[in-house]
């Protein structure tokens, strides 16, 4: 019997030396490698967390997708992973292809099999990560946490978790979210990282010529 996808997942930071959080990678593997080298990332002692959207648009989507199988990487699901899973499950590919999924069609048959296997594993990606580190309690979701009060295992609209930009669009109100120290999101490409109270937006458009943002949580 197929297990339901987890919504929430917890990470205990004391298991790791350093914890790094990456903005949307979108197939930009070389940018990620350079950033990890610069921060002296150690895959045996450190953890890399992705805010989702490791695939599509960039040059190395398959390699980035396969990163999720490494013991030193974890991620929340992004809307692009969800589009890919939905496309393969339904065989309705048009939405995914219009949004950067054409790399999959260009793969050789054996590579498509590898991609399908990796995307099947994405069914186990949580929508929301709660990370307990030496710098506090961090909540990570791809686009938004669609409530003004965070609670572990609270029912929230998962479509908004993957797609919503409304909170960022209302940033002039300056309202944060209670229930954790920091909230981290990607999804909306920005020229630079945006911090509004305890809300942090770190998709800085690596695939569009911007820098890939890497944040040290511990």
Swiss-Prot record:
This is Serine/threonine-protein phosphatase 1. Mn(2+) 2 binds at residues 53, 79, 187. Its EC number is 3.1.3.16. One of its GO terms (biological process) is RNA decapping. Keywords: Hydrolase, Manganese, Metal-binding, Protein phosphatase. It comes from the Bacteria. Its cofactor is Mn(2+). Plays a key role in signaling protein misfolding via the CpxR/CPXA transducing system. It also modulates the phosphorylated status of many phosphoproteins in E.coli, some of which acting as major chaperones. Has been shown, in vitro, to act on Ser, Thr and Tyr-phosphorylated substrates. The active site is at 80 (proton donor). Belongs to the PPP phosphatase family. PP-1 subfamily. Disulfide bonds: none annotated. PROSITE patterns: SER_THR_PHOSPHATASE. Transmembrane segments: none annotated. GO terms for cellular component: cytoplasm. Changing residue 107 to Q: Loss of function. It is an enzyme of class 3 (hydrolase). Pfam families: Metallophos (PF00149). Binds 2 manganese ions per subunit. GO terms for molecular function: bis(5'-nucleosyl)-tetraphosphatase (symmetrical) activity; metal ion binding; phosphatase activity; protein serine/threonine phosphatase activity; protein tyrosine/serine/threonine phosphatase activity. It catalyses: O-phospho-L-seryl-[protein] + H2O = L-seryl-[protein] + phosphate; O-phospho-L-threonyl-[protein] + H2O = L-threonyl-[protein] + phosphate. The gene is pphA. Mn(2+) 1 binds at residues 24, 26, 53.
């Amino acid at each position: 019997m197929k297990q339901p996808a987890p919504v929430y997942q917890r990470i205990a930071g004391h298991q790791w030396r350093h914890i790094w959080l990456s903005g949307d990678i979108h197939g930009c593997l070389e940018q990620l490698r350079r950033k990890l080298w610069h921060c002296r990332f150690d895959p045996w002692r450190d953890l890399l967390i992705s805010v989702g959207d490791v695939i599509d648009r960039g040059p190395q989507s398959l390699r980035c997708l396969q990163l999720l199988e490494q013991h030193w990487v974890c991620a929340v699901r992004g809307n692009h992973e969800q589009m890919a899973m939905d496309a393969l499950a339904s065989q309705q590919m048009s939405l995914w292809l219009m949004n950067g999924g054409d790399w999959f069609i260009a793969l050789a048959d054996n590579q498509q099999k590898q991609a399908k296997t990796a995307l099947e594993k994405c069914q186990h990606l949580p929508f929301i990560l709660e990370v307990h580190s030496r710098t506090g309690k961090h909540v990570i979701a791809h686009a938004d946490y669609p409530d003004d009060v965070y609670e572990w295992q609270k029912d929230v609209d998962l479509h908004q978790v993957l797609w919503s930009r409304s909170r960022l669009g209302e940033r002039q109100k300056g309202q944060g979210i209670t229930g954790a120290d920091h909230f981290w999101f990607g999804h909306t490409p920005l020229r630079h990282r945006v911090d509004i109270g305890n809300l942090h937006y770190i998709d800085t458009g690596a695939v569009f010529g911007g820098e890939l943002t890497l944040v040290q949580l511990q």
